Amino acid sequence: VVLHPQFATNRLLYISYVKPGANGFGNLAVARARFENDRLGDVQDIFLANAPGNGTNRSSMWGGRIAFDRQGYLFVTLGDRQWPAVPDLSRHPAQDLLTHNGKTVRLHDDGRVPKDNPFVGTPHALPEIWSLGHRNAQGMAFDPATGDLWQNEHGPLGGDELNLILPKANYGWPVVGYGVHYTTGAAIHEGTMKDGMTPPAYVWVPSIGVSGLTFYTGERFSGWKGDLLAGGMRGQRLMRLRLKDRKVIADEVLIQDMGRIRDVQQGPDGYVYLAIDAQVRGKDGDPTPILRLVPVPRVS
């Protein structure tokens, strides 16, 4: 759920969800609604992905992160729907510009395609696509100082990535990467780098199951100002990443083993809030805890 940049006046918010389809298949959708008098009204879908599942794992790898940039454009991440990375890596749906599998898209706030999108007018390409070659981006944040767009995304067994997202860039999945096959441990990719494919700014090996990404801009943790905070589900950790000139120059594990971190956000009070996946606290359906981080004085 993301608020429109002018939410205070227009009361619009945006929700990504999986819209059911025929025969149990579904696709990622983004709905826009108006929140007034403690109720949602004027609910309408403004985007429905064309990201076919593989027929066996069709309920996974959806993507679904949404964010607005400074100009009011809406960005949406789409997962690869867990298509296997065989036999021809270059023909994987994440490399196909006629599907939304493994893509980032850029839209107007009403779902229209901006005329200056990088693939507008390109034959055999969906015009809303902004970037391609992703597996499953589960965190997205704009740098408030520069306007740069950053994402973290799941690798397979190993190889989670932090990427600087540029228009028309190809991030390589599954042709290049740092992960291996889940069951056999065999190599998946051609290598870690290839001409025409953008390498990650940072890699987690082993993977931590990245989820959630935000820039800290508050005053409560003054030493973190301008840094990225990234959550991990499998790794059950919160990480701090310091950037300089679009590169990661330092990293730190802030929290370890407090649960599967699904999302991390800075509150209006300047504290940091973590959404913990319910799976670690009990069976699905149990209350999902929200944790608040507050600074404490160091004890010498």
Write out the residue ranges for each language-model feature:
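Acidic/polar loop patches that form or flank catalytic/metal-binding clefts of enzymes
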Residues: 113-116, 149-152, 170-176
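Acidic, Gly/Ser/Thr-rich repeat motifs that build Ca2+-stabilized beta-propeller blades
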Residues: 2-85, 139-142, 147-155, 206-251, ...
